[in-house]
Amino acid sequence: MANLKALLLRIKSVKSIQKTTKVMQMISAAKLHRVQQKLENAKKHLLELSSIVDYVPSDGVHNCASIAKKERVLLVVMSSDRGLCGNFNNLIVKFTKSYVEKLESSNKEVKLIFFGKKAYDMMYSQYSDKILNVFSNTKSITDFLYFKLFVYNSGIDFDQFDNVMILFNKFYTTILQKPDAQQLIPCNLGIPMLLKEVYQYEPTYVDVLSTISLGYVLNLMYIAFLENSASEHCSRMVAMESANRNTKDMLNRLALEYNRSRQASITTDLIEIISGFESLN
């Protein structure tokens, strides 16, 4: 009887877990859909910025992609604040470690900034001397405006570095996400030397280009952030789907074990009743 009660408690517990994983899977699917819409809009915005740059003359403008020597490198690492998303964070941590080793082998000074605390927690013990800061609570970023405020309030000074890279899990499809690196600074805008038309700029085209370049870099960061968020939600959705399947298999095994134990208990009770009846006769 005690064994049957224990099995019933396990079945109840697994059913509760199954409900939780199912809800988390549905929530992740809904969040993934919203992030995909934001990602599509952000890419359109980046395309518009790129087209504007095509009309800015480059004579006399310092090209931000013409830095000859790169000595100090900042890696902005995107991860998640929460777990239960498969190997999502493990992939970006492994990719970051490999990237750091490659840069240091080229005699570069590497510093790290983390968006999302999971990768930070996994790398702190080994790279504590290279970490400048970590920013958690990234779920509060709901749109591009909040993202800009988040970056400004973070106090990141890109001017201290010759090269700034952002490392994130790039979203390709719902079944394919891979770690990727995107260069932020120098920002390769690809400004043409000759233009078909000439425009006048206020106050100067240097200021115009500077403003556009800043917007371009922020937009690249925002797209990487959205790509990483989409990959996180997709990984969590797949992980919860797998967990849901496992709970179904476990429930089937527990139900079979419960029925066998119950049948054995009933058989034992019947044998005892028959034996008692025979002893009375």
Swiss-Prot record:
It comes from Ehrlichia chaffeensis (strain ATCC CRL-10679 / Arkansas). One of its GO terms (cellular component) is proton-transporting ATP synthase complex. Belongs to the ATPase gamma chain family. GO terms for biological process: proton motive force-driven plasma membrane ATP synthesis. It comes from the Bacteria. This is ATP synthase gamma chain. HAMAP family: ATP_synth_gamma_bact. GO terms for molecular function: ATP binding; proton-transporting ATP synthase activity, rotational mechanism. It is found in: Cell inner membrane. PANTHER family: ATP SYNTHASE GAMMA CHAIN, ATP SYNTHASE SUBUNIT GAMMA, MITOCHONDRIAL.
